[in-house]
Amino acid sequence: DAIESLRASRPWLRHIRHDRSTGQSAAVRTGVRHARADVVCTLDGDGQNDPAFIPALYRALDEAGATTGLAQGQRVGRKDTAFKKLQSRIANKVRGAILKDGTRDTGCGLKCFRREAYLALPYFDALHRFMPALMVREGYRVVHVDVVDRPRLTGTSNYGFLNRAFVGIFD
């Protein structure tokens, strides 16, 4: 396993895994609960999120001060199909009209957030879609950072039109 081989030269690296696939929200929560740092940064594993933007997200969070719980990436130059971009645009408009949290793109996996703020959020599946609104509800501010989207390098999306729409509505 690649992670195990890296641990020999990186003693700080830990390998945490679930016994079975549990979904994005559960994976992030497990990682955050095991994190030792005060700030946690996330990105999707399909290659669309460029890790080069993590320092900018961290800086934005740090400069905004302790009352800011989340620096949320917002994709520019999306590399998805026109249909997928249309779905996201509609979903984000509906979501934004209801939640009024000022976030135009909750689907971006690039985020930096205060561990303490994240752990104060109520946990539910699909939490990652609502992090900005939940941070605001808990009294934190949210800052947004434009990040450049890249074409997907690996895997396939687990989110389609119907499950994205219905899960979002029910949540």
Which residues does each PLM region occupy?
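Conserved alpha/beta core of the MobA/IspD/sugar-nucleotide pyrophosphorylase nucleotidyltransferase superfamily
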Residues: 140-147
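Flexible glycine/serine/alanine-rich "lid" or loop that lines and gates the nucleotide-sugar donor pocket
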Residues: 137
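A short, conserved beta-strand element in the Rossmann-like catalytic core
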Residues: 48
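Carbohydrate-interacting regions of secretory-pathway proteins
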Residues: 1
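Acceptor/aglycone-binding surface of glycosyltransferases and processive sugar-polymer synthases
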Residues: 4, 12-34, 39-42, 51-129, ...
